[in-house]
């Protein structure tokens, strides 16, 4: 229905959606809320901090990046996606909603060297194993982009590992990584992050009481 209407609500705003991007989910709103809880603090007018550097990897419709750009005070937001079509939709949403986001065409699995540093890296990457597709709704399989949904059965953490390794190189001291995950593999994600040297790893449940979100800090 959302593709027919061409829109979906997310965090109090209406986003344009087409078949080239995932439909924003309520679960992902909870991920954004977690970040805002942690970082949306009042700014002292006498000593304004440097803008909070935020990177959203796999932005799709731009719902995460745009919401953070509009809601978090004094932030500078960049967003990557492998799909040029998705970036066109995301840019349109940002323009319509009045958000300043730097969108870039980038593959999370083959990230080029970057000298940028980030305070926050957030991602809701593909995390559904191919073997799980039989249990999924037919309308999802027919209309939503498979590249944004599925990972190989033998490598379910491929995006999480690549992004966590990027974070090791580009997160500022005390910088934080936020993931939406497949509840079936969230313990493996936690172990991977610990093995890479992340600390203060926290898990959070979604509205269905499933462990879905991970937060980890690089000290």
Predicted ranges, named:
Residues 1-73, 77-89, 215:
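SAM-dependent Rossmann-like transferase core, predominantly class I methyltransferases
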């Amino acid at each position: 229905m959302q593709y027919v209407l061409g829109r979906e609500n997310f965090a109090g705003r209406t986003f344009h959606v087409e078949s080239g991007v995932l439909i924003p989910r309520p679960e992902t709103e909870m991920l954004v809320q977690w970040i805002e809880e942690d970082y949306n603090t009042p700014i002292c007018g006498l000593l304004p901090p440097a803008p909070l550097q935020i990177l959203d990897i796999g932005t799709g419709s731009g719902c995460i990046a745009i919401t953070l750009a509009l809601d978090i005070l004094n932030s500078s937001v960049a967003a990557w996606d492998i799909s040029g079509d998705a970036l066109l939709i995301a840019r349109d949403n940002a323009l319509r909603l009045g958000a300043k986001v730097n969108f870039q065409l980038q593959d999370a699995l083959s990230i080029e060297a970057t000298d940028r540093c980030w305070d926050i890296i957030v991602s809701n990457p593909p995390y559904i194993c191919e073997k799980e597709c039989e249990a999924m709704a037919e309308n999802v399989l027919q209309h939503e982009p498979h590249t944004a949904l599925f990972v190989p059965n033998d490598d379910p953490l491929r995006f999480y590992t690549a992004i966590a390794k990027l974070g090791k190189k580009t997160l500022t001291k005390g910088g934080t990584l936020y993931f939406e995950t497949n509840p079936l593999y969230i313990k493996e994600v936690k172990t991977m992050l610990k093995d890479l040297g992340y600390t203060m790893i926290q898990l959070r449940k979604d509205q269905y009481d499933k462990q879905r979100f991970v937060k980890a800090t690089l000290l």
